[in-house]
Amino acid sequence: QADLREYVASSTGDIYRDGQLRLMIDEDGSTMGCIDLFDFDPRNRKAAIGMYIAPHARGRGIGTKAVKLIEEYAFGFLKLRMLYAIIATKNTACSTIYKKEGYEPSSILKAWTIEDNAILWQKIHE
């Protein structure tokens, strides 16, 4: 909890300064998870997406809505040309969200974690 307080206190909310932006996913006053833009590269106009949905909030379309909203911000306001996500191959629920939203698998990352490979999903914005 101290690490979280430190992160919140030190974050400016400026993706250009911090290189990342973390947004909490809230529904009716309850926190359902968070979504991040990180590895922000303004020169090449790309960023990674990370997302966590609390177990009690899964299966309700919250992740899909969060990805759509972060895309609007990334492609519309930040003028990014590419977003990507690295998803463990076992995390089929998350891969389903990205596939449904038009991301394409571009590579398999072998032994990405101790337990699993990962899939690199990309969406190029024309």
Identify the residue ranges that each predicted region occupies.
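Active-site rim helix/loop that mediates acceptor-substrate recognition in acyltransferases
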Residues: 1-20, 27
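Acyl-donor (CoA/ACP) binding surface of acyl/acetyltransferases
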Residues: 26-126
